[in-house]
Design a protein with these regions (language model features):
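Extreme N-terminal, non-catalytic leader segments
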Residues: 1-19
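Hydrophobic anchor at the beta1->P-loop junction of P-loop NTPases
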Residues: 24
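The conserved Walker
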Residues: 28
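Conserved glycine(s) of the Walker
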Residues: 31
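Conserved substrate/cofactor phosphate-moiety recognition/catalytic segment
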Residues: 34-86
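Glycine-rich phosphate-binding loop used to anchor ATP phosphates in small-molecule kinases
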Residues: 72-117
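Conserved phosphate-donor/acceptor-positioning beta-strand/loop module used by diverse small-molecule
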Residues: 115-137
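Small-molecule kinase domains that catalyze NTP-dependent phosphoryl transfer to phosphate-bearing small molecules
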Residues: 139-183
Length: 189
């Protein structure tokens, strides 16, 4: 059965409550995954981590192959999220979306997905001072982070911490973690 058929059939059903499409964005080591894990302790949602999907194909982040994987990953995320929302499940997506968040078309795509699945969209961006991000990258010690650390200034040029943000909530993860989570949970609900 195709997704459009499912959408038509499922849209006739009324879920008990409106599902939430929650997207957590931010540069690597901005605190997205820590925030996501804590939210999931307090809010039931299907969890999609972009890096888990990408890393199954490649750890390389600079090649044309990665760009193709990235595009396919985003399509897969959209499909998985859409199907789950149609079944009334909350969905939390954890992904950098570093260039995408500056593009209104990206926002419009998720706004349309939320509308088509009768869900509420919640966009959250994690930020932190660049010194903290650099320290977190070093502490994390992933091979995929070595090029970022080697050319940290160029990395920040490609993936700036502060951008023109078209989302809804921005959280500084260098601040009080418990308060941030409390604010996010209030925003989500």
């Amino acid at each position: 059965m195709k997704s459009k058929q499912i959408l038509t059939e499922k849209s006739k059903q009324t879920p008990k409550s409106t599902p939430k499409l929650i997207i957590i964005t931010g540069v690597p080591c901005s605190g997205k995954s820590s925030v996501s894990r804590e939210i999931l302790k307090n809010f039931k949602a299907m969890y999609i981590d972009k890096d888990m999907i990408n890393d199954g194909f490649t750890l390389e982040r600079e090649s044309q192959f990665y760009q193709k994987i990235r595009e396919g990953t985003y399509k897969a995320i959209d499909n998985i999220a859409g199907e789950n929302l149609l079944y009334g499940n909350n969905v939390l997506i954890d992904g950098t979306f570093s260039t995408e968040i500056q593009n209104k078309k990206w926002f419009d795509r998720y706004a349309k997905l939320a509308k088509d699945t009768r869900s509420d969209l919640r966009l959250i961006r994690c930020i932190a001072p660049q010194e903290l991000i650099k320290r977190r990258l070093k502490q994390r010690g992933f091979d995929k982070d070595k090029p970022k650390l080697k050319a940290f200034d160029e990395f920040l040029d490609r993936e700036p911490i502060i951008v023109k943000w078209i989302g809804q909530l921005e959280i500084d993860t260098s601040k009080d973690f418990k308060k941030n989570i409390k604010d996010i949970l209030k925003f989500i609900n």
